[in-house]
Amino acid sequence: MSKMKLDDLDHQILDMLIENTRIPFTDIAKKLLISAGTVHVRVKKMEEYGLIKGSSLILDYDKLGYTFIAYVGLYINDTSKIKFIVQRINEIPNVTVAHITSGKFNIFCKIRAKGTTSAKNIIFKLDEIDGVYRTESMISMEESINDKKR
């Protein structure tokens, strides 16, 4: 598929959708002084091209009681087990992000917990996965930047 060329109108539509994925096409159309049909066609093209991949729900973890955030680096003794280890990590619901990385750790995870006891139990679960020989944890003191628009 060839590269999709976005014009200013496409960028304006995207900016509005990034700000609020649930904004009705009619609202976008009114603000941009175009028809809702134009918005629909352009969004559909961006979806077909794969530029837009659905929409997402953003949870307020604080309101759910998950105020404790930690980052856990996993050292793996056999990198051929990484796929298996990632599958096991995916079974732990409190692990919200996992990256296969270069450098100090083989896998780097973000966990959310209701407190230190819960976080300890999650970290122990990660440490018990076959193939993980050590973990290293860092507690997040404050999430200063979390810009979903970047």
Q: Residue ranges of each PLM-predicted region?
A:
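A compositional/biophysical signature of low hydrophobicity enriched in polar/charged and small residues
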Residues: 1-150
